[in-house]
Amino acid sequence: MLYNSNDIQKIIPHRYPFLLVDRIESIEGNKVVGSKCISANEMQFLGHFPQKHIMPGVLMLEALAQTVAVMLLSKEENKGKIGLFAGINKARFKRQVIPGDKLTLTCEVTKERMGIVFVN
């Protein structure tokens, strides 16, 4: 493990209940791998859905955005900056994510132009 939750909070501004990445496992070049363990006690499950907890897809996308933000904002030249999620193309969800699951969050920066970063 490269960064735990305490380390991550020193890099990105997100806090409970909206901190959606637990660990950064590795950063190699333009690729980052993080993880999020899904617990039944998380706030989103109060309403999505009380009888059948399913992690909302938009929160999985946010977890990916936070993962890449840790990689980018941990660089010396980006310290003190904040990253904004501007859009997404072709998101697909292959199955439901439920309490007890562990999300592996893999992102790779493919292009950077005028301060905008493109990520797969």
Give each language-model segment a name:
Residues 2, 68-106:
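Hydrophobic beta-strand-centered segment that forms part of the acyl-chain substrate-binding groove
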Residues 5-15:
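Short aromatic-glycine motifs in intrinsically disordered, low-complexity regions
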Residues 9, 51, 93-95:
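Beta-strand-rich interaction surfaces with strong enrichment in secreted/lumenal proteins
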Residues 15-55:
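Catalytic strand-loop segment that frames the active site of acyl-thioester-processing enzymes
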Residues 21, 88, 118-119:
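Hydrophobic residues on conserved beta-strands that form the core of alpha/beta folds
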Residues 23-26, 90, 95, 109-111:
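A residue-level detector for short acidic-glycine micro-motifs
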Residues 29-33, 97-101, 106-120:
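HotDog/MaoC-like acyl-thioester-processing domains
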Residues 47-56, 60-70, 85:
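Compact, glycine-rich, soluble single-domain proteins
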